[in-house]
């Protein structure tokens, strides 16, 4: 008959205590449980209370007595506590930091409604957290938790559905203790004290860290390094499971994130995932999952670097590496390549990894593994951290040590393919395209933009293009059925437009011409009607040369932006001025300018809404077509380059040309200034403005000449210094805003009112007579022509 499981466990523990008797006393502990154990004593050395001498403190190891025929052998937990010496009264211990009565959860985990928490006397010292049955002398010890630098504390938190008490959880290597108190202040006091004790502990080092130090110290001796690898299997490739992490990770009970286990358990799971790579039919998704885990749990990044260094060392250590012809043997190197292009290892791990790569290159200089080692070393020197893990396409390219192909659309030049890697920035791509198009000496600045339908966003110069491609690809997969799911990268004008001195033979003139047209079609606010008709005539002249009655009539929707639908403005109560009103009032931020713009926009909007109504009715749409065609006829003889230059000069005078809008939060600079206010920041060619969401008219505006400085003061906070005052704005796009504002500040332009006429387009002054708005509602015999345009 087999022995019960509990009895086997008891015998093993008893044998273990017998073998380790030297750690607990000087006497010989017998394994038979005779009466000699009841008289066993040993001496603890402690400072003498009198002077600096050392006295002795006798501690007796007592065994509980039992009556009846049952065995006198101790239960496991009783024998464990019998080997822990009693320190005497907690009040007499000078190392006590905090003590008091607290509730503790019963054994077996969380509290249950039918089992109430029990009170215990807790004592916190600089080495452990002990609990006793009472606060008096000779109290029985109920438990103890040794505190190290890896212990963690969570809370205080309240659990109304369980105990209704405030709890603080202390996690150790084997178990955790949850301290409960009905008062939040007391729970916070214990939490702070526990964290201070843990923070004061010296960092623990794992055996792997000690071996890494030995390898670093003997790095110049290959034989010594090889000997360390041969004697320590923890550093070599293995097909067995890993039961503990290689680096010291904190003990935790709660998961660090949704869907994850505690860190130490996740480290073991990562090693299992690495071993699964050898037989995976599609290793790409598995690699991406491992990278995403390290992205969500940064504490595991160095752990994974060490695990990969272990698995790429070969079963016998360097230079005994696995066969390079086996595809499964290369997958560890491929994942290490992806890791080196995504994360930056820590100091000690980085040094060990670089040494491991160097030894691999020296052992097999002409092998494929040496090529991977050289690629990884270069990547480690350039990697600065990624916002997103590589996509499947990037993982496939990195596994072959190849570059990615990125397509950038350039107005007037088509699609330009650009080769990038995991470290290429948007600024580098923009500079390469500017050099290709011959725009290096241009006065205009250009940048890379992310465009999706009618929405576009400037990319900061330091943005990694690989991260942008990954985010756009993932969003496109999630929006397959959306009409705006199409996206692309484009090179665009970034900052003020300088149309002067453009060469008719270069690429810059058609590049800016096509871009200006695309910007005007999405302009906010749209230019006046007379300017739109003049621009449409100039575009027709540049595309089709002189007007011909036999040619097809152009479509207005490709020449002019669609009219905005009429919107009624409901009556609103008077608002309290925003915090920026007092800051930016007077000469810097002019409310009078906003009023004039609002009145002008009201007149323009009324005229355009009337025209839109007339076009819907079918009576007055021909007036716009007739005006555009009339202006086109008067441009007979103008060359293509001349028409493009006139188009750019006229477009540059429009206040809404190239304007960018950003959603920002305005922060008050005064203490107690109130909650942040949601506003829209508009950056135009001549000035910047602040407006409320949903409104096209600004509440305040200021020219760039009054902006003294623009700088970052936080991760998402931008400071604009206007005169002697400061404006604080928060936005996730602060880097783009700062680059655009600094581009405008570096290229000041004289303030001038917007006009539909200018030196390059003086012959267009008759294309839109002043009485045009009065005759829009009257049919002018062009309904057939308009019908032909719509067809």
Swiss-Prot record:
Task: Tell me where the signal peptide lies.
Answer: 1-18
What gene is it encoded by? Plekhh3
Q: Which residues does the record list as Phosphoserine (modified residue)?
A: 30
What CDD domains does the entry give? Answer: FERM_B-lobe, PH3_MyoX-like
The segment(s) forming the MyTH4 domain are: 237-399
The Polar residues compositionally biased stretches are 59-71, 754-791
Region listing for Disordered, in residue ranges = 29-71, 549-580, 593-623, 748-791
Biased composition regions of type Basic residues, renumbered to the chain? 594-605
Residue spans with biased composition (Low complexity)?
A: 549-559
One Pfam family this chain carries?
A: FERM_M
Domain PH span(s) in chain numbering: 95-199
**Every FERM domain range:** 404-755
Give a yes or no for keyword Flavoprotein in this entry.
no
Which ranges are annotated Acidic residues under compositional bias?
29-41
Where Omega-N-methylarginine occurs, the residues are 636
Q: What is the lineage of its organism?
A: Eukaryota, Metazoa, Chordata, Craniata, Vertebrata
Q: What is this protein called?
A: Pleckstrin homology domain-containing family H member 3
Species annotation: Rattus norvegicus
Which UniProt keyword terms apply here? Answer: Methylation, Phosphoprotein, Signal
* Gene Ontology, cellular component aspect: cytoskeleton
Q: What's the domain of life for this entry?
A: Eukaryota
* One record GO biological process: signal transduction
């Amino acid at each position: 008959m087999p022995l019960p499981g509990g009895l086997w466990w008891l015998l093993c523990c008893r044998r273990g205590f017998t073998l380790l008797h030297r750690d607990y006393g000087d006497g010989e502990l017998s394994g038979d449980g005779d009466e000699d154990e009841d008289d066993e004593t040993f001496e603890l050395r402690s400072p003498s209370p009198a002077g600096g001498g050392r006295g002795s403190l006798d501690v007796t190891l007592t065994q509980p007595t039992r009556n009846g025929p049952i065995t006198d052998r101790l239960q496991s937990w009783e024998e464990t506590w019998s080997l822990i010496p009693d320190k005497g009264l907690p009040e007499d211990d000078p190392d006590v930091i905090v003590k008091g009565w607290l509730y503790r959860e019963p054994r077996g985990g969380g509290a249950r409604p039918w089992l109430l928490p029990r009170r215990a006397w807790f004592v916190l010292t600089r080495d452990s957290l002990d609990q006793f049955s009472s606060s008096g002398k000779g109290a029985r010890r109920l438990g103890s938790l040794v505190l190290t630098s890896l212990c963690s504390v969570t809370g205080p938190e309240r659990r109304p559905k369980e105990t209704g008490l405030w709890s603080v959880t202390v996690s150790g290597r084997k178990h955790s203790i949850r301290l409960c108190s009905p008062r939040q202040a007391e729970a916070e006091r214990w939490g702070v004290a526990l964290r201070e004790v843990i923070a004061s502990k010296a960092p623990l080092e794992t055996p792997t860290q000690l071996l890494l130090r030995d390898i670093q110290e003997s790095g110049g001796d290959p034989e010594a390094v090889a000997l360390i690898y041969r004697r320590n299997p923890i550093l070599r490739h293995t097909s067995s499971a890993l039961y503990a992490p290689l680096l010291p990770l904190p003990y935790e009970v709660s998961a660090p994130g949704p869907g994850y286990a505690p860190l130490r358990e996740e480290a073991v799971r990562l090693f299992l995932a690495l071993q699964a790579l050898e037989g995976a039919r599609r290793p790409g998704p598995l690699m991406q999952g491992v990278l995403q885990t390290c992205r969500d749990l940064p504490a595991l990044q160095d752990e994974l670097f060490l695990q990969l260094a272990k698995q790429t060392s070969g079963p016998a250590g360097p230079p005994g590496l696995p066969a390079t012809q086996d595809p499964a043997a290369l997958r560890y190197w491929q994942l290490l390549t992806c890791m080196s292009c995504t994360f930056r290892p820590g100091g000690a791990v980085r040094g060990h990894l670089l040494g491991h790569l160097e030894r691999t290159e020296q052992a097999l200089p002409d092998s494929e593994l040496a090529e991977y080692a050289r690629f990884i070393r270069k990547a480690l020197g350039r990697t600065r951290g990624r916002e997103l893990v590589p996509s499947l396409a990037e993982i496939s390219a990195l596994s072959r040590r190849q570059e990615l192909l990125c397509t950038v659309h350039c107005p007037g030049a088509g699609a330009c393919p650009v080769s990038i890697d995991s470290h290429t920035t948007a600024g580098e791509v923009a500079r390469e395209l500017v050099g290709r198009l011959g725009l290096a000496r241009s006065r205009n600045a250009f940048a890379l933009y992310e465009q999706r339908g009618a929405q576009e966003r400037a990319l900061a110069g330091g943005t990694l293009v690989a991260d942008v491609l990954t985010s756009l690809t993932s969003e496109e997969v999630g929006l397959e059925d959306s009409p705006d799911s199409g996206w692309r990268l484009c090179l665009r004008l970034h900052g003020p437009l300088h149309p002067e001195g453009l060469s008719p033979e270069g690429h810059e003139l058609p590049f800016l011409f096509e871009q200006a047209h695309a910007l005007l079609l999405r302009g906010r606010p749209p230019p006046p009607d007379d300017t739109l008709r003049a621009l449409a005539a100039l575009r027709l002249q540049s595309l089709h040369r002189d007007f011909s009655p036999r040619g097809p009539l152009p479509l207005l929707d490709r020449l002019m932006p669609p009219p905005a639908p009429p919107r009624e403005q409901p009556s609103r109560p008077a608002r309290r001025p925003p915090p920026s009103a007092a800051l930016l009032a007077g000469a810097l931020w002019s409310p009078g300018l906003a009023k004039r713009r609002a009145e002008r926009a009201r007149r323009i909007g009324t005229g355009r809404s009337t025209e839109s109504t007339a076009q819907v009715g079918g009576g007055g749409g021909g007036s716009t077509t007739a005006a555009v065609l009339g202006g086109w006829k008067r441009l007979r003889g103008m060359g293509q380059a001349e028409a493009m230059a006139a188009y750019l000069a006229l477009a540059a005078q429009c206040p809404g040309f190239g304007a960018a809008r950003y959603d920002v939060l305005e922060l008050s600079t005064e203490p107690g200034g109130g909650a942040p206010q949601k506003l829209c920041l508009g950056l135009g060619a001549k000035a910047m403005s602040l407006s409320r969401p949903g409104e096209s008219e600004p509440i305040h505006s200021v020219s760039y000449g009054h902006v003294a400085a623009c700088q970052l003061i936080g991760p998402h906070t931008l400071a604009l210094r206007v005169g002697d005052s400061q404006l604080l704005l928060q936005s996730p796009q602060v880097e783009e805003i700062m680059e655009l504002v600094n581009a405008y500040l570096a290229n000041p332009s004289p303030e001038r009112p917007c006009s539909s006429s200018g030196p390059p387009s003086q012959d267009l002054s008759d294309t839109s007579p002043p009485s045009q708005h009065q005759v829009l509602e009257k049919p002018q015999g062009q309904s057939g022509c308009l019908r032909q345009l719509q067809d």
